[in-house]
Amino acid sequence: LTNTWLIYALGGGWGHLNRALALGRIAAKDRKVTIITNSPYALKINHENCIVNYISEQAGFSTTCQQVREIILSTQCDRLIIDTFPRGLGGELADILPQLQAIPRILIHRDINPDYVTAKNLRSFVAQNYDTVIVPGEGQDLPLADLPNVQHTAPWLIRNCEELPDRMSVRSHIFKVNPDIKTILVCAAGNASELSFFAQLTLRLQQNFPQCAVRILAANCPADIPEALWISHHPGIECLAAADIVVGGAGYNTVYECAAVGVPLVAFAFQRLYDRQAKRANQVYRVQNIQQAITTVSTLLDRIEVTRNLSMPSYINGAVQALHYISA
């Protein structure tokens, strides 16, 4: 056995890459883990002992598909793990998966638009081409969650609770904030095109809550944001855990990381081609515009005790559960 796991994690934003790293870093203790990604964020962060095959997001559609196929067909692996898109983001896996019957093929079933599932006849494709389907904490109400080979785990997180740094040290060293000041963190994950919206949101929050510290967590510093407000830190969960309130989108990482560390999330549900942020946003404080966000933050601030930040969060990391299912 080569004892190599190959993880397909193509797709925008942080979610696909972060899930791959959450699983890959614990799997890599006992085997080689290779991740295929086209997330530009992959160039900025620690690869957690995984080998990252980066395909430029500037590469055209056919080039990307070709590169993916070449990597998969030339990698000797004993697990092939596909995140979210059963046929690949561009359908590039549709004809190669049936050739790989000898390798256990695992689908990570993040929520996905049911119209896409129907249009591409994914139900029968998954039934024929995947040995196991793992739902990473997204609940029962998913298009493929009733297939017979489905396993459910808690959400996948890139840090176990005992690995998180002390909240107060994050506040002082990373946020550069006094421990007794309430902190509002804007989490600018998602698409680069949304960065200017998050910047505007950050400035409005700062105007409205001068008694609080407001920070923006983003891979790149937005144009109109003073450098003192900007935080670039990966993994983001270490920062979310140290905030009093998080304001962001309703993507996979933001929602489940905030839930795990017990910090309230005020969230905008952004439109995505395949993801249903609106469905996930039902679990958090959903808002439609900046004014609603300000009102909601104001209400939450009245309820929050700063002392909460002294306790360490406790949660189950679904990536650890998934490791057992996949290696079985």
Question: What are the functions of these language-model segments?
Answer:
Residues 1-214, 221-328:
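Nucleotide-activated sugar donor-binding and catalytic core shared by glycosyltransferases
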